[in-house]
From Swiss-Prot:
This is Small ribosomal subunit protein uS4. Residues 91-154 form the S4 RNA-binding domain. One of the primary rRNA binding proteins, it binds directly to 16S rRNA where it nucleates assembly of the body of the 30S subunit. HAMAP family: Ribosomal_uS4_B. One of its GO terms (biological process) is ribosomal small subunit biogenesis. GO terms for cellular component: small ribosomal subunit. It comes from Phytoplasma mali (strain AT). It comes from the Bacteria. NCBIfam families: PRK05327.1, rpsD_bact. Keywords: Ribonucleoprotein, Ribosomal protein, RNA-binding, rRNA-binding. Part of the 30S ribosomal subunit. Contacts protein S5. The interaction surface between S4 and S5 is involved in control of translational fidelity. It holds the Pfam family Ribosomal_S4.
């Protein structure tokens, strides 16, 4: 399954979950896409597991193939599988660029990385899935600071997170691994574990 590039607003309403983490998609039309939305049917176990997986996959904007690979990688780490999975998703370079406020959306952040605007420890990294390590430094190329999308994003004053720092010179740092309560509080990651572990 390829990465979804359509409207996250429609997907948010379908899942009844804010993929932008702002809640804006659900304010005006808190129902599924369609004339008046489709009647919500109570999901069974499989449906709940699938829905939870889709919420997280669409939040981070990655393909099913990538998503499943990260899930498998998380299973090799010490710790609770579901939590390790969220930590790996959160440490992706495109996500951290978004968290730093260099882009308004993760999709924009992915484009910045793809087009070579981002440096990690002073070296260009153009792989959105690059997994950052604690202590690494993330910056924009000097010329890239003048990009309109970057200026607009920085002016947006996104609520930044404590595990990623940013100074006045726009030097970002992946300070520490986030705590579980700092990530997607409305997500039940155990349902995703059950989805992939089902027989």
């Amino acid at each position: 399954m390829s990465r979804y590039t359509g409207s996250i607003w429609k997907v948010s309403r379908r899942l009844n979950y804010s993929l932008s983490e702002t809640g804006k998609e659900l304010i005006k039309r808190p129902y599924a896409p369609g004339m008046h939305g489709k009647k919500r049917i109570k999901a069974k176990d499989y449906g709940l597991q699938l829905q939870e997986k889709q919420k997280v996959r669409f939040t981070y904007g990655i393909s099913e193939k990538q998503f499943k690979k990260i899930f498998k990688d998380a299973g090799k780490l010490k710790g609770i599988h579901g939590e390790m999975f969220l930590f790996l998703l959160e440490s992706r370079l495109d996500n951290v660029v978004y968290r730093l406020g260099f882009a308004k959306t993760r999709q924009q952040a992915r484009q910045l990385v793809n087009h070579g605007h981002i440096l990690v420890d002073g070296k260009k990294v153009d792989i959105p899935s690059y997994s950052l390590r604690v202590g690494q430094i993330i910056t924009l190329k000097e010329k890239s600071k003048d990009l309109i999308i970057v200026k607009e994003a920085l002016a947006n004053k996104l609520n930044r997170v404590d595990y990623i720092s940013l100074n006045k010179e726009l030097v970002g740092k992946y300070v520490r691994i986030p705590h579980r309560d700092e990530l997607l509080p409305n997500i039940k990651e155990q349902l995703i574990v059950e989805f992939y572990n089902r027989k």
